[in-house]
């Protein structure tokens, strides 16, 4: 979901490997495909040091890109990170291996309640483990929004971007949306009072029409560019992933560029997503992949990743190790009251997904 480490990162092989990893280390290269900027800077190096396995690490910024590679076959990857809303149909399509839990002793660290919830997409939790989760909400530059809007900008509401008279005021300072129809159109549906997983053509059309009304005031649709643009003050509002916006905030603070970034979960509610770790059916290094999955389930490793990417994780044993500032931030770890207003992204039927994609193409073109 971000771009800090570049398109491809080859983790250098370091000397040594631990006992019990000999079989995994027989195959010395592991190909991992993950969301951009979604791992700690030294995670891969630590894995290589422990196992002797090099990691070739590529990134993407949409589920659609990953799914196209998986369904085409021979993706070339050993580990991938699909969102839960795409997982069920990909499992049905037979693109993933079942996990050999006998080789995953760190499985015990996972959040049991979350694992139960995730069985809706993956019965028996046979194919994937939770990596990170988060929300899709409003990232904004309070100074630029105030300059454009005045003191009464509804920064805690979808009204900020879904009412034409509001978003029109923000055009001069820049507004971006995720380029993800299956995550953003449900936000419009929810705002209009419809179910986010509706397959009603009239309701889907209403969401499309809402976006066409605000389209002239949207600067761009992209699923990662907004991070640097928010951090640098190039845009003033981004509808994006919670952790990405917090990373933009951190980058601005590190740069000391006098840019302030904040994040709100809209009071009407918002979508929540779960990103999973899975092994493709055609993985060439299954043993190395299992070693990597087990490594990610180490509490100290997962806590370090959360501290960097600022998304909450699905590892119960890791939560106490996450920095207090992140654990106590309601934008990252929402309160129970806010959690009740969140919805999960549905596993949409192919017909509905195609309809959303057609609408999205129309919305982006503005026609």
From Swiss-Prot:
Work out whether the entry's keyword set contains Signal: yes
Highest taxon of source: Bacteria
What InterPro entries does the entry give?
A: SBP, Sperm_putr-bd
Pfam families per UniProt:
SBP_bac_8
Q: Name one GO cellular component term.
A: periplasmic space
Q: Which GO terms describe its molecular function?
A: putrescine binding
Q: Which residues bind putrescine?
A: 36-37, 244, 275
Known outcome of mutating residue 273 to W: Significant decrease in affinity for putrescine (to KD=0.75 uM)
Cystine bridges: 173-236
Q: Which UniProt keywords apply?
A: Disulfide bond, Periplasm, Signal, Transport
* GO process terms (BP): polyamine transport
Look up the signal peptide feature and give its range. Answer: 1-24
Cell compartments where the protein resides:
Periplasm
Disrupted-gene phenotype:
No change in type 3 secretion system (T3SS) induction.
Which coarse location class describes where this protein primarily resides?
Answer: periplasm
Q: What does this protein do?
A: Putrescine-binding protein probably required for putrescine uptake into cells. Binds putrescine with high affinity (KD=3 nM), spermidine with relatively low affinity (KD=6.8 uM). Does not bind cadaverine or spermine. Putrescine binding induces large inter-domain conformational changes.
**Which family does this protein fall into?**
Belongs to the bacterial solute-binding protein PotD/PotF family.
**Protein name stated in the entry:** Putrescine-binding periplasmic protein SpuD
Which organism does this sequence originate in?
Pseudomonas aeruginosa (strain ATCC 15692 / DSM 22644 / CIP 104116 / JCM 14847 / LMG 12228 / 1C / PRS 101 / PAO1)
Gene that encodes the chain? spuD
